[in-house]
C-alpha cells in the first residue's frame, strides 16, 4: 500500500513538472523576437559601418533627416524668389516666330529657362466699383507684376468708358418711386347724420306708441287632463322624467314642467304639467325618489297661437305619457277619456 502511494506521488510530481515546462515554452514561443535575436540585426550593423562621413552608403542613399519648417522655407522659397527677380520683364504681347521646333532643338547653346506666362486676372465689376472712389492700389505680386502690363484706371472716367472697360453694362441707379397722391377724403357732415338718426328714432317711437299693446287677457276656461296610476301602483319619478324630456317638457316657473312653442324650451308656454298631489310641484334633483298617484296637464283659454293645435299637442303628449308609465288617461272630472268628452272639449275650444 505504501509502495502504491509512493508511485502515485512520483507520477503526480512528474505531471506537474511537465505542465510547468510546457507553459514556459508556449509563453516564450508567443513573445516577439528582439532585435538582437533577429537575423537582420547583423545586416543593419554592416550597413551602418559602410556609410561614409557624410552619411551616404554605397548606393548614395543617406539617412532620414527631419527638418524644421523654417529650414525648408530658406532652402526652397528663397531661390525661387531670386530667379523671378533676376528675370527680365516679359512683354504683354508675344511675338510669333517662323523658326520650327526642330531647328530650335538642333541649335546648341546654353539652356535658358523661359518664364511662364501668367494670364492677367480680370477684375470683376463688383470689385472695380470699390476702387472708383479709392486711390489705394493693391500691391503687385512678384509673378504678375513682371509678366503682365499695368492697366491704369482713371476714377474720373465716364460711365460709358467704365462699360467698355469691364465689358458689362453698369446697372442704372433706380430712381426713387414717389408715393401716389391719394385724393382727399370728402368731409362728412356729422351734424347732418346725427339729425337724421334722431329723426329715425322719433319716427320709430311714434309708431310704437300708436301700436296696440297686447295686454294679458284673463283666462276664461281651463282644459284639464289627468294621468292616473292603475290600482295598487304608483308613478315613479325615475320613469316620469325621461318621458317628459322626450316630449320637450322643460322644468320652469312654479316648480312644474312646461311645454313651450319651441322644442328647445323657449318662447310662449302652450300648456303645463303639475303633480296631482299637493303642493303640486316637482323636485328635479330628487326625481329618482319621487312617487305620486298621478299628474295633471292643463291649458288655459284663450292662449297663445291656435288653441286647437295646442290642445292636439297636449292630448298626444298625455297619450304618450300614459303609455310610457302604464297609467290611465282621465278627463277633468277624473273620468275615463271618451269620444263624448273629446267633443265637449272641442266645443269649449271653439267657444273660446
Swiss-Prot record:
The chain crosses the membrane at residues 7-27. The lineage of its organism: Bacteria, Pseudomonadati, Pseudomonadota, Gammaproteobacteria, Alteromonadales. It comes from Shewanella frigidimarina (strain NCIMB 400). Interacts with FtsZ via their C-terminal domains. Residues 78-120, 138-160 are annotated as: Disordered. The gene is zipA. Residues 83-105, 141-160 have a biased composition (Polar residues). Residues 111-120 have a biased composition (Basic and acidic residues). Pfam families: ZipA_C (PF04354). The keyword Cell division applies. Belongs to the ZipA family. This is Cell division protein ZipA. It is found in: Cell inner membrane. Its main location: membrane. InterPro entries: Cell_div_ZipA, ZipA_FtsZ-bd_C, ZipA_FtsZ-bd_C_sf. Residues 1-6 are periplasmic. GO terms for biological process: division septum assembly; FtsZ-dependent cytokinesis. GO terms for cellular component: cell division site; plasma membrane. Essential cell division protein that stabilizes the FtsZ protofilaments by cross-linking them and that serves as a cytoplasmic membrane anchor for the Z ring. Also required for the recruitment to the septal ring of downstream cell division proteins. Residues 28-352 are cytoplasmic. It is a single-pass type I membrane protein. Keywords: Cell cycle, Cell division, Cell inner membrane, Cell membrane, Membrane, Transmembrane, Transmembrane helix.
Amino acid at each position: 500500500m505504501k509502495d502504491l502511494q509512493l508511485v502515485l506521488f512520483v507520477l503526480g510530481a512528474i505531471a506537474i513538472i511537465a505542465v510547468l515546462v510546457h507553459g514556459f515554452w508556449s509563453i516564450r514561443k508567443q513573445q516577439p523576437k528582439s532585435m538582437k535575436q533577429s537575423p537582420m540585426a547583423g545586416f543593419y550593423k554592416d550597413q551602418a559601418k559602410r556609410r561614409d562621413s557624410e552619411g551616404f552608403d554605397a548606393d548614395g542613399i543617406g539617412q532620414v533627416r527631419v527638418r524644421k519648417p523654417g529650414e525648408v522655407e530658406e532652402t526652397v522659397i528663397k531661390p525661387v524668389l531670386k530667379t523671378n527677380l533676376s528675370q527680365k520683364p516679359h512683354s504683354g504681347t508675344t511675338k510669333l516666330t517662323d523658326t520650327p521646333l526642330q531647328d530650335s532643338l538642333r541649335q546648341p547653346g546654353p539652356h535658358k529657362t523661359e518664364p511662364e506666362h501668367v494670364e492677367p486676372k480680370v477684375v470683376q465689376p463688383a470689385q472695380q466699383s470699390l476702387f472708383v472712389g479709392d486711390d489705394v492700389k493693391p500691391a503687385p505680386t512678384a509673378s504678375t507684376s513682371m509678366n503682365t502690363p499695368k492697366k491704369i484706371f482713371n476714377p474720373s472716367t465716364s460711365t460709358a468708358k467704365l462699360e467698355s472697360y469691364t465689358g458689362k453694362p453698369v446697372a442704372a441707379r433706380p430712381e426713387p418711386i414717389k408715393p401716389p397722391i391719394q385724393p382727399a377724403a370728402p368731409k362728412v357732415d356729422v351734424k347732418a347724420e346725427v339729425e337724421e338718426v334722431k329723426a329715425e328714432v322719433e319716427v320709430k317711437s311714434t309708431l310704437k306708441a300708436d301700436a296696440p299693446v297686447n295686454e294679458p287677457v284673463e283666462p276664461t276656461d281651463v282644459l284639464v287632463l289627468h294621468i292616473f296610476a292603475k290600482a295598487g301602483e304608483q308613478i315613479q319619478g325615475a320613469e316620469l322624467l325621461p318621458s317628459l324630456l322626450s316630449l320637450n317638457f322643460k322644468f320652469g316657473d312654479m316648480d312644474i314642467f312646461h311645454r313651450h312653442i319651441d322644442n328647445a324650451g323657449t318662447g310662449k308656454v302652450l300648456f303645463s304639467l303639475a303633480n296631482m298631489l299637493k303642493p303640486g310641484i316637482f323636485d328635479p334633483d330628487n326625481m329618482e325618489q319621487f312617487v305620486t298617484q298621478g299628474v295633471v296637464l292643463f291649458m288655459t283659454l284663450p292662449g297663445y297661437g291656435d288653441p286647437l293645435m295646442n290642445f292636439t299637442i297636449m292630448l298626444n303628449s298625455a297619450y304618450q305619457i300614459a303609455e310610457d308609465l302604464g297609467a290611465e288617461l282621465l278627463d277633468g272630472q277624473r273620468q275615463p277619456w271618451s269620444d263624448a268628452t273629446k267633443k265637449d272639449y272641442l266645443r269649449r275650444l271653439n267657444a273660446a
